[in-house]
């Protein structure tokens, strides 16, 4: 229930703008371990749980923390190739985007086929569940190829990130990380508009309004892996 507690609006996009933003898993650790927050008190008093253990399961990739092996196993259930979050959002996104990729995934077969392997102290899948796993993996590939990484989505993402980056990198920016928590996506956009107006960032304002109103940049060129890839990428970096 708490694995997404560290999310802020557009966080999968904004957390790429490091070091201003932190990963939502790291933010979840900060929230859960804060003794002044109700979540910390409820975990200790109502559920008799150690908040550190809960934070370890969520923020298991944190290199600055020594994560016990038993917590890594639970983290593998929560966030892995077959985690419930992935099973949920891939099928749901497929349905609401009107693409058929999620229809081939047998969710019930997938869940019942997941077992614990005591020899390796890890999750395993029975032979009957192999086809269900393959369907999920292929669905994941198809969703990224055709939806998540579609050039229209990438255009909107790039425009929004640049609009935010121009604000945050300004020497007179007054926004802080905590300003992005506990607000809705609409409130975040209003906050950015106000800061762009105050700082006089007309270019960033145009990018933000273009994203909101779907006036997106068009595909200018397509670069495939090859000998000129580094040269072309450097050209675009120098251009901007």
Predicted regions and their residues:
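Alpha-helical phosphate/pyrophosphate-handling elements in metalloenzyme active cores
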Residues: 1
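Histidine-centered, transition-metal-coordinating active-site segments
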Residues: 5, 9-240
């Amino acid at each position: 229930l708490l694995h997404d507690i560290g999310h802020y609006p557009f966080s999968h996009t904004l957390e790429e703008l490091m070091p201003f933003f932190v990963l939502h898993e790291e933010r979840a650790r900060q929230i859960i371990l804060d003794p002044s927050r109700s979540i910390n008190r409820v975990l200790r008093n109502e559920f008799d749980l150690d908040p550190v253990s809960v934070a370890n399961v969520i923020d298991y990739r944190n290199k600055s923390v020594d994560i016990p092996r038993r917590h890594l196993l639970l983290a593998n259930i929560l966030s892995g190739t077959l985690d419930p979050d992935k099973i949920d959002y891939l099928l749901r996104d497929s349905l609401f985007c009107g693409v058929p990729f999620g229809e081939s995934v047998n969710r019930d077969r997938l869940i019942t086929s997941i077992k614990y392997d005591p020899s390796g102290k890890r999750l395993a899948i029975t032979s009957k569940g192999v086809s269900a796993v393959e369907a999920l993996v292929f669905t994941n590939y198809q969703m990224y190829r055709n939806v998540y990484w579609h050039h229209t989505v990438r255009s909107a993402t790039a425009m929004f990130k640049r609009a935010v980056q121009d604000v945050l990198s300004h020497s007179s920016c007054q926004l802080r990380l905590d300003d992005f928590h506990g607000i809705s996506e609409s409130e975040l956009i209003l906050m950015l508009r106000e800061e762009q107006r105050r700082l006089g960032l007309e270019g960033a304002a145009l990018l933000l309004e273009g994203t909101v109103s779907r006036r997106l940049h068009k595909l200018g060129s397509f670069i495939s892996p090859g000998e000129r890839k580094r040269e072309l990428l450097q050209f675009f970096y120098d251009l901007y």
